[in-house]
Amino acid sequence: MKDFIKKPPMGWNSWDCYGAGVTEDELLGNAEFMRDRLKQYGYQYVVCDIQWYEPAAKGNVYNNFADLCMDEYSRLIPAVNRFPSSANGAGFKPIADKIHSMGLKFGIHIMRGIPRQAVHRNTRIYGTTARARDIASQFSLCPWNTDMYGVDTEKRGAEEYYDSLFKLYASWGVDFVKVDDIANTEFSPQNPYSAEKEIELIRAAIDRSGRDMVLSLSPGPAPLN
């Protein structure tokens, strides 16, 4: 287990200005502003928030059951119409490289779990013969977004799925991952920590990825009783 960071990360998250619809030009424009105006005060993280894999995403209203950009191994990839440099399998690496060249760090947002689209198509998982349908927990749902099912951490292939995700992110040069919908799930309101086993797999996958990444957990709407 890696150490906790010494102080809260200082940076910018695209949700605050663009909701789910940020583009490559907007992301890099804000990175340039941070480099020129904020870096000297300790700001360093440029984070691309939710649904970078959704071609039609706009604002803060989600398109239910949208067609998502995904590779053959059930992993979401950037929408090329919004992030042109991600074409031909490049992923976020070109953007991360540009942000790193500014002396800054690059982060992404992900939703807990595996894409429902992958489950419906029963696509492969890298490093195992298990498929998406084998590891999905179809009663573990986010109440406000339809992109994902939870992962059944007891199933063969669950660990390999999360490992493959974070090895992909490491190859892109990701420094920070915000994982959302991490508190109670729709069918477990009585259990505010129903996603805790997925947190454990995510943390372990980061440690095995070969790259240091800050893990930031976002609960989503959660009861405080």
Question: What is each residue range found by the language model?
Answer:
Residues M1-T23:
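Mature N-terminal, pre-catalytic/accessory segment of carbohydrate-active enzymes
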Residues G220-N225:
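Substrate-binding cleft/loops of secretory-pathway carbohydrate-active enzymes
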Residues G107, V214-S216:
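Structural detector of well-ordered beta-strand residues that form the stable sheet scaffold
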Residues D25-K39:
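Zn2+-dependent metallopeptidase catalytic core
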Residues V22, E26-G29, A87, G157, ...:
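Alpha-helix N-cap and loop-to-helix initiation/capping positions
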Residues R35-A170, V174-P189:
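Aromatic-lined carbohydrate-binding/catalytic grooves of carbohydrate-active enzymes
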